[in-house]
Structure formats: C-alpha cells, structure tokens
Amino acid sequence: MEASWLETRWARPLHLALVFCLALVLMQAMKLYLRRQRLLRDLSPFPGPPAHWLLGHQKFLQEDNMETLDEIVKKHPCAFPCWVGPFQAFFYIYDPDYAKIFLSRTDPKMQYLHQLLTPCIGRGLLNLDGPRWFQHRCLLTPAFHQDILKPCVDTMAHSVKVMLDKWEKMWTTQETTIEVFEHINLMTLDIIMKCAFGQETNCQINGTYESYVKATFELGEIISSRLYNFWHHHDIIFKLSPKGHCFQELGKVIHQYTEKIIQDRKKILKNQVKQDDTQTSQIFLDIVLSAQAEDERAFSDADLRAEVNTFMWAGHDASAASISWLLYCLALNPEHQDRCRTEIRSILGDGSSITWEQLDEMSYTTMCIKETLRLIPPVPSISRELSKPLTLPDGHSLPAGMTVVLSIWGLHHNPAVWNDPKVFDPLRFTKENSDQRHPCAFLPFSSGPRNCIGQQFAMLELKVAIALILLHFQVAPDLTRPPAFSSHTVLRPKHGIYLHLKKLLEC
C-alpha cells in the first residue's frame, strides 16, 4: 500500500515534466519547420543547384572547391540560394547590378559570422555596425592618408629586402625551389608591425611571431568550418568539441601578442624624448592610443585591443596571400613577368631607392596586380544581414533578415561579366577597358561606405614587393606541386606556393 502511494506521489510530477519537455521539443520543431517553409517560399523565385535535404550545400561549402562555384555561376549567372543545413540559407550574388544595389545600402554585417570573430579579435571595424562603426572609421581614416603612407615606402622596401637576403642565402644552384608563402607572410607581418604599430620585431629573422602566424591560420580554418557546419552553430556543442577547445586556446595566443604590442608601444611613447612638441605621430596605433587618452569612455581598452587585433590580422594575412598569388600568376605567365621586370628596371634602376612617385609610374605592373586580384581575390566573399527588404534588378525581392553573400570570386569569374575569365590578361585594366566596364564588376576591396580602409596601403605593399622581387629573381612554377585554395576568411594557398627561383646576377 505504501509503495503504491509513493508511486502515485511521484508519477504525476514526472508525467508533467515529461509532457512539458515534449511540448518544448514540439514547439521547437514547429518553429524550425515554419522557418524552413518561410525560407523555401522566399527563395522559390531563384533557381540553384540541388541541395541535400539535411546537409544542404555543406559539401560544396566545406571543400574549398572553387571550380564547383564556377560551374554554378555559369548555370545561374546572377545569384543562387545556398543552404547550410535544413533551416539556414544564404543568398549568393555575383552580378554587378545586384552588387551595386547591395553595396549601396547600410545593412549590418552578417551577425553570426561576426559573433564567431568576436572572441578572437573583439569588436573592431571588421565587425562593428551603426554609430560605433562610423566613430571608429572616422577616427582611423587619417592613418591611411597619402601623406602618412608615403614614408612607409622605405619601410616596406627594407622588409622586402630582408626577405630577399634570406632567399639569396637559400639560393645555392642555378635554380632553387622555395615555398614562398611562409616567407611572404612573415614579411607582411614585419611591415604591418613597423608601419602600423611602430615595432621593430625582426620577426623574419628570429621567428618570434611564428606562433602568432600559425594561430591566425588555424583560427581562420576553424571559423570557416564552423560557419558552414550546421551542428556547430550551437555554442554548447561547439565548445565541447575538440575544435571549440582549440579555438579558445588559439584566441589566448592572439590576445597575448596584442597585449604585448600595446604595452610595448605605450612604454616607447612614455619614454620618448620629444624633440618637437608640435609634431604628432600619425602611425595607426598612436592615433588609437591618442583617442583613448582623450576620452576613455568613447574608446575603451576593449576597443583598443579590437582595432589592434583587426589590423594586425587583416593587415598582413590578405596582403601575404595577394603577393604570393601575384608571384604565382607571373610565374605561370613569363611573358608578363618579363614585361613587368623591364618596366620596373626602366623606372627604379637597381631598386636601391624607391619613391611613391616611381611606384605610380608602374602602369603595366599595376595592371598585372589588378588582374591577379580579379583572378584570385584575397577576400572571396562579404556578407550582410538585410535590415529591410531588398528589391533586385529583376523585380524579385528578399525579405528583411535574409543573409546575402556577395561572392567576389563568383563576380570576378562570371563569364557574363568577363570574357574568358580564367585567362590571365592584364590588358583588361587599360584605361579604355576599365572605363567601359561596369563600376561594380571588379571589387577586390569591396565598394561603398564599408570598402576596405587599407586598400591604398595594400596596393602600395604589392607594388614595392613585386618590384624588388622581380629585380632580383626570375620565378617559375613548380608544376609537381600546384597550389590549392584554402577558402577561409582569406583565400590562402592551402599547402603553400612552391616556385623555382633563379637569381638575376646583374642585381
């Protein structure tokens, strides 16, 4: 009798708890079902490649298969819906008219992607929106003014020459094969440390920042993998996974380096004996530190760390990829390489000194740089979350809340926009051809109010690097080890870029 009473006493609460849990599961299932039906309705006017009912297009998204994207662009020349699992979809666009409308708006960045970035870099220009973004942008823009960048030419040239000295020591025969991306990555890090942070690290020689470079690469891989893995969208599942644990450890590495840079610069400024009190330093970090000193509430310690993280990461990674791909393209196309070298010699001589004005004269080399950025854009896509409905040129509309991805790769490889898009043809960028082209056909640095703040710095770095490299070496591809793409936040070479280097003895 007593057992029966106890069973009755506990059975009802357990029954109610079970019913409550079941109701929650059913409510969540209904919510997801309605979300999927809404997405299917909104995206029904837009054809696209078939998607797996559960995985969506994850196979295509996770394989770094740019050829598959090229095939999709051929079949669907403006846009297509891309499913990430059964309940999440992005809308990919790669048509200049679509891009023009998309970039003219002020929609916020894709929130989920930038939530993934925040633990690594904080909330800086890359992932801020609204008034806070505008405040940071206005504050940092002066650091990239032409008058501030001109003195950087000598600094960049010095860092490139350090790398070339290493290559010359490695060069022992008529032709030496070198994996160039690793060296170029350290060189661009050296440049950003000097030009933006006022730090003489000698990182190309002493290897002090190798763990930082490795951490940025691995973080990029994890972020990209998580973005397109439906199961890892849930924070708890991700944090309990091996990748989640690795992500947290790598984030600590990034923050340690950032904190050291900030503290070292503060000490330098504190101990600096000013010869001219009216002279103000205009390097990036000093501008940020000055802003914080004026109003710490408007620009906090977190803001400071976020901007240093953002520019340290973005400032060297994309540049390293661009220079490496430029070298590879010129190695594959020796006739263009020779023409660039001839132009560079006629302007720079032996390259012992380089000026801003001389770099501006390198018209054919600049066209080769732009063609490389078209063929292999360093940032393959950008994304926004629509704050209000978007009406496309064909009259169809997308609702607020939809995530739109502008595929810069797709745009630059769209045969409806570019003739023979796979062919390396620098003459696409003559003044006549550029004037006849849609203004949004070529977007390596994006466009509109949120374009890349450092694009002038990046172009300067590309010109200095390629000029000095071609003056000292002839490059040819190692056809036994062709590079593969690693499409994360930056389009890197997955296993490096191997080139045959032949020293030009007249230099």
Curated annotation (Swiss-Prot):
GO biological process, one term: lipid metabolic process
GO cellular component annotations of the record: endoplasmic reticulum membrane
Catalytic activity: N-(5Z,8Z,11Z,14Z-eicosatetraenoyl)-ethanolamine + reduced [NADPH--hemoprotein reductase] + O2 = N-(14,15-epoxy-5Z,8Z,11Z-eicosatrienoyl)-ethanolamine + oxidized [NADPH--hemoprotein reductase] + H2O + H(+)
Membrane association type: Single-pass membrane protein
Keyword Nucleus: no
Location of this chain's protein in the cell: Endoplasmic reticulum membrane; Microsome membrane
Sorted UniProt keywords: Endoplasmic reticulum, Heme, Iron, Lipid metabolism, Membrane, Metal-binding, Microsome, Monooxygenase, Oxidoreductase, Transmembrane, Transmembrane helix
Family matches, as InterPro entries: Cyt_P450 (IPR001128), Cyt_P450_CS (IPR017972), Cyt_P450_E_grp-I (IPR002401), Cyt_P450_sf (IPR036396), Cytochrome_P450_Monoox (IPR050196)
Alphabetized Pfam families for the sequence: p450
Family: Belongs to the cytochrome P450 family.
Protein name: Cytochrome P450 4X1
Organism: Mus musculus
